Amino acid sequence: MTQYWLGLDCGGSWLKAGLYDREGREAGVQRLPLCALSPQPGWAERDMAELWQCCMAVIRALLTHSGVSGEQIVGIGISAQGKGLFLLDKNDKPLGNAILSSDRRAMEIVRRWQEDGIPEKLYPLTRQTLWTGHPVSLLRWLKEHEPERYAQIGCVMMTHDYLRWCLTGVKGCEESNISESNLYNMSLGEYDPCLTDWLGIAEINHALPPVVGSAEICGEITAQTAALTGLKAGTPVVGGLFDVVSTALCAGIEDEFTLNAVMGTWAVTSGITRGLRDGEAHPYVYGRYVNDGEFIVHEASPTSSGNLEWFTAQWGEISFDEINQAVASLPKAGGDLFFLPFLYGSNAGLEMTSGFYGMQAIHTRAHLLQAIYEGVVFSHMTHLNRMRERFTDVHTLRVTGGPAHSDVWMQMLADVSGLRIELPQVEETGCFGAALAARVGTGVYHNFSEAQRDLRHPVRTLLPDMTAHQLYQKKYQRYQHLIAALQGFHARIKEHTL
């Protein structure tokens, strides 16, 4: 009987399930859309019961369409978005809707913390910046605005922790994710009560479940879950992965010469290093990586291809091929139309919002689409340039995410950055990485390093056009000037409203 490992991937828009054999060959993938709720401007929530129903449905669909039985599945892992907040009450029931990482309701709290110097106080211990989607920001918001709900908190989790609990009935917070929550002391490798004390949320210390490893077997499929999904009761479930870690793992990032760029709702640039550094040029975000003694370092903001998805939804459905043809039909770096990809947040200050600048009657939809492509790449450059100050010997950027399927967009990224672009040929990095964690956890591999060596994916390479690089550098500089001017505008508005 052929054995398989199941990988679940819960993102911002889709819940996916993939099956892989011992050699990593895909036996099937199923996807179901996820609904995000926005009961008020700037809020982003998810119905927790509905998410579990969707999870069960995608597992059932995968088993049905693949012809694989639950008896053949010998391990399960989950990859998911980081941050946000999934709460259980003291009776182990979902406590309201989950709050997603793109939620901005805690902006005033974060602004207040910034004025009080809290981020600078936290960073040496947590190696995290502090923003609206962090669990700690959302917990403080609940304490101030929904105190009755806050008082009922029995367990604090994030996305894949919640789904793992649904599957197994066992609570835990997976380390690659919880290490980036501002609840975790990076040097100590554990929760630190002084953090919640500084943040004014010490009441939730009792609600923090045990920290579990990515490949650690945390529980088994319950009889109830088995009856609802077709899985076999007793199948082991491992801790899983923060999706950024899963992507870096699948991209084969293992030294300081190559970085990984993830292009999705979030613009993320990641690198792998051994040890923490003090006195760096920027407050780089660190997280625990899957190998002992290693850390993932990244820069990120919600400023990537989600902006294109919003545009096409609002202004008429158009296929990805048609978009690429439209963008390719225009001269590279031509014109003075700019797009600021800040629909869901920015990397240029809390007040910054999205928009086109320089639009005239001569511009067509193709020009707007080109400006979106450029704006997303320019925003990625903000993070890439900062990361290259730390990873000084980088010569290659490995790119994953939806835009990696667009040669037009990837060539633009190569031309703007001047870097060699490599595209790992793996379709579902979240599912594959989660299943890989399950293979490590069930003993197929001794560790993730051994698994990476055994499962190298082919890559496709694009090289920069250095003539276009010079043109894009000039336009990127103008983009930076526009950002600076708008930052000045917001600063003056703030002065007049005080």
UniProtKB/Swiss-Prot annotation:
InterPro entries listed in its UniProt record: ATPase_NBD, Carb_kinase_FGGY, Carb_kinase_FGGY_CS, FGGY_C, FGGY_Carb_Kinase, FGGY_N
Gene Ontology molecular function: ATP binding; L-xylulokinase activity; phosphotransferase activity, alcohol group as acceptor; protein homodimerization activity
Reaction catalyzed: L-xylulose + ATP = L-xylulose 5-phosphate + ADP + H(+); 3-dehydro-L-gulonate + ATP = 3-dehydro-L-gulonate 6-phosphate + ADP + H(+)
BP-aspect Gene Ontology terms: L-lyxose metabolic process
Superkingdom, natural source: Bacteria
CDD domains: ASKHA_NBD_FGGY_EcLyxK-like (cd07802)
Keyword tags: ATP-binding, Carbohydrate metabolism, Kinase, Nucleotide-binding, Transferase
Coiled-coil regions, chain positions: none
pH dependence: Optimum pH is 8.4 with L-xylulose as substrate.
EC number(s) recorded for this UniProt protein: 2.7.1.-, 2.7.1.53
Record function comment: Catalyzes the phosphorylation of L-xylulose and 3-keto-L-gulonate. Is involved in L-lyxose utilization via xylulose, and may also be involved in the utilization of 2,3-diketo-L-gulonate.
Assembly information from the UniProt record: Homodimer.
Family statement drawn from the similarity comment of this UniProt entry: Belongs to the FGGY kinase family.
Annotated protein name in UniProt: L-xylulose/3-keto-L-gulonate kinase
The organism of origin for this protein: Escherichia coli (strain K12)
